[in-house]
């Protein structure tokens, strides 16, 4: 999370926007405190609802650069329906989905992206569910911009952020 935070903080000035015209909306989970560390407007929303709240904000305030910060549990479990609809509507908002394949904030429950057989506190005999593939889900929802990167490659991460910011629609 901190590597992504540092990359986003370093990249934001490139947008050339006043900080009061940038908003970060988060849900619940490991990534949810993200807006507190940005020198912009932000909202820490309820579990799974960040895409819905951000959609409302982006459609009512087209002058804002709206970013969603969410995790695999928040976006692909309780918030899955909101994520899918945000992607298919192609509203001008940017979604950063942190996929650590575990509910880290609650000390290790398996998540929708955990591998089969993953032993956690909630699956002591190993998880039975096949994992979601977030990229396939986004493509299936007909998202107009889909990218994947890794936090340890700052150069690539920043390039993906740049391309997402330039994309007119959901990225």
Segments predicted by a language model, with ranges:
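Generic secondary-structure signature for well-ordered alpha-helical cores
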Residues: 1-4, 10-17, 59-62, 88-91, ...
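Active-site-proximal loop->helix
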Residues: 80-85, 105-118, 137
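Active-site diphosphate/adenylate-binding microenvironment
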Residues: 1-47
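Conserved thiamine diphosphate
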Residues: 112-167
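Thiamine diphosphate
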Residues: 30-104, 156-159
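Conserved active-site and cofactor/substrate-binding residues in soluble primary-metabolism enzymes
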Residues: 2-7, 19, 48, 52, ...
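Core alpha/beta catalytic barrel or barrel-like domain that forms the active/cofactor pocket
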Residues: 22-29, 33, 103-106, 131, ...
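General beta-strand structural signal in soluble alpha/beta enzymes
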Residues: 23-26, 68, 95-98, 146-150
